Amino acid sequence: MKGPTLALFLLLVLLAVVEVRSRQTVKLCGLDYVRTVIYICASSRWRRHLEGHFHSQQAETRNYLQLLDRHEPSKKTLEHSLPKTDLSGQELVRDPQAPKEGLWELKKHSVVSRRDLQALCCREGCSMKELSTLC
């Protein structure tokens, strides 16, 4: 009876330590910030997630190319049917009636928020969970 109780206790302590570490803030500036973000985003968990997303995008592209062979749509039709993605591979949702300047504003906002997080990490510190939002 003592063995399972001790094992359960040690497991709970381990989980508590992991939770505290994820909440800890670390001040990261310059190259340390960049290295940490790359380390977090390049972990095997993120790579598996991105590989799955990449394969689904390839399948979608293949389907669009097959449609192209059959129907040969105009350039304008093709622009509206293909999914729009940003540099991170995330799909952008955009109203076809909205002006094109809105897309630039979206990208500018993304870059600004990343710069803000970098400045905040350097000044006050940030947690690993906050850094993982950049992936």
Swiss-Prot record:
Pfam families: Insulin. SUPFAM superfamilies: Insulin-like. Residues 1-22 form the signal peptide. This is Insulin-like peptide INSL5. Keywords: Cleavage on pair of basic residues, Disulfide bond, Hormone, Secreted, Signal. Heterodimer of a B chain and an A chain linked by two disulfide bonds. May have a role in gut contractility or in thymic development and regulation. Activates RXFP4 with high potency and appears to be the endogenous ligand for this receptor. It comes from Mus musculus (Mouse). Belongs to the insulin family. Highest expression in colon with lower levels in thymus. Minimal levels in testis. The keyword Secreted applies.
